Amino acid sequence: AALAAAGYRYNSSINPTWIPTRYNNLRAPCSVSREEGLTIYPVSVSAPFRVPLFWISLHVMPLPLYKLLCRSALRRDGHLNLYFHPWEFSARLREPAFGVPGYLTHCSGTDLQRKFIRLLEWLKARGCRFLTTREYLGCDE
């Protein structure tokens, strides 16, 4: 209710998965829904096991596995809602001063950029369209 009262039209912060000490949203819907005046657009998870397809997953999973999980979400939901942070694509992520764990830095910077481009090319070849959240949900300005 607070988000709608503040003028927001959608909430895309729901991760419908279970991650120890972070999320326990296994009962949350995986597709677009409505709640308290807001459109809920959850982050994509695989089917049927709800493996999160968020930014960490692309870092740590082999691309063929990530694609397989994306395919399962596409079949169930008809869309993917993926998010990444700009800093993940920086080569500076590997610098000790940033204190980022090695499991994230081994595929960051240009390595992650290349992996991401291959993912986008694969999605495009499958006929996927790329839209902003606002376009996909049909939210007015």
Identify what each model region corresponds to.
Residues 61-141:
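C-terminal domain-boundary segment and adjacent tail
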Residues 1-83:
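Active-site-adjacent pocket scaffolds in enzyme catalytic domains
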